């Protein structure tokens, strides 16, 4: 992970409701952090890899997502893709009245770093 991205993530975490994050580098290597006991490192890395693959496969349909959000009963999974091929997946608790705009703003900042 580059120093700029490491500093970016460390200065903004943990956010309210953040269960985990995973940063995937263009070479496929990953860094992650969990703020809960119910997400294992393997779950975090494999989920982030699958989501990045799903978003990447949309490119073949001429769809170019910058951010994607999957909503499940207990989690929202946010994915941001950077032009350099790196991605950030955020695992956020799916709480009522949670300020999800804050999460989207973080992803926009990640893309711009």
Give residue ranges: language-model regions.
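Non-catalytic interaction/Regulatory regions outside core domains
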Residues: 1-25, 29-113
């Amino acid at each position: 992970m580059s120093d700029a991205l490491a500093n970016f993530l460390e200065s903004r975490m943990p956010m309210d409701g953040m269960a985990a994050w995973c940063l995937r580098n263009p070479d496929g290597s990953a860094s992650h952090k969990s703020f809960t006991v119910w997400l294992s490192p393997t779950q975090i890395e494999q989920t982030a890899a699958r989501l990045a693959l799903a978003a990447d496969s949309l490119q073949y349909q001429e769809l170019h997502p910058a951010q994607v959000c999957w909503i499940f009963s207990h989690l929202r999974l946010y994915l941001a893709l950077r032009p350099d091929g790196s991605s950030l997946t955020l695992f956020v608790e799916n709480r009522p009245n949670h300020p999800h705009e804050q999460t989207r703003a973080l992803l926009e900042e990640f893309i711009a770093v």
